Every structure is written in structure tokens, then in C-alpha cells.
Regions:
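Polybasic/polar functional segments that serve as interface/processing modules
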Residues: 1-118
Length: 118
């Protein structure tokens, strides 16, 4: 196995938080730090006409990325680590900052058919 991909669907998030680029950029940085992951550059964010944001942070272990839909009070969050990072600790940063009313989490093994290295 290459790594774990944590997919988080966060619902019922205050719309103003989902358009706050500063807050979400800080979440990316803090999530990497808390998860013991190593950024290879600064967070990158793009704002769309409707106010939604897409952002990502490239990591030496892979990436953290999100897409916000403020009109639906929803954020899709991906945390993929092919190293020793703690994806759940990284997720906790977003949960604390965004305070979703509901969440749906899925963890997917990536490269499951590839033998683990020693």
C-alpha cells in the first residue's frame, strides 16, 4: 500500500467561513503541522465567481486539498498521505475551525496492491 486517502464531506458549515481565504489557508498550514506533514510550498487558493474557494497544500507526503460550496454550506476535503503523517490530526484542524453540523468520512487505501516497503 502506498498510503491512506481521507475524504471528508463537511455539511452545515457557516457560509462566511467557507469564503474566508485567510482562515482556510491557515487551516491548510496548521493541518500539515498538526498532522506531522511537510509542506513543499505555501498554500494555493483560488476564488470562483460565486465566492467558493479551491485550495491545496502540496506535501512531501502528498497533499491536502479542499473545495468549498458556500451556497450549500459544504466543503469537500481530501487529505492524502503516503508517509507517516496523521490524517485524522490534520482533519481535526478543519473540524475545529469550521464546526460542521454533520460530517461523512471515508478512508481509502491507495495502491493497496503494491507491497509495503520495510
Amino acid at each position: 500500500m502506498i498510503g491512506q486517502h481521507l475524504l471528508a464531506d463537511l455539511y452545515d458549515v457557516a457560509s462566511d467561513r467557507l469564503v474566508d481565504a485567510g482562515l482556510l489557508a491557515d487551516c491548510l498550514d496548521e493541518a500539515a503541522r498538526r498532522g506531522g506533514m511537510n509542506p513543499i510550498g505555501p498554500p494555493v487558493l483560488h476564488r470562483f465567481e460565486g465566492g467558493g474557494l479551491t485550495g491545496y497544500l502540496l506535501l512531501s507526503e502528498s497533499h491536502i486539498a479542499f473545495h468549498t460550496y458556500p451556497e450549500h454550506r459544504y466543503i469537500a476535503l481530501d487529505i492524502f498521505s503516503c508517509g507517516g503523517g496523521d490524517s485524522k490530526a490534520a482533519l481535526s484542524v478543519f473540524l475545529a475551525a469550521l464546526e460542521p453540523g454533520r460530517e461523512h468520512l471515508t478512508t481509502a487505501p491507495r495502491g493497496a496492491e503494491i507491497p509495503q516497503r520495510d
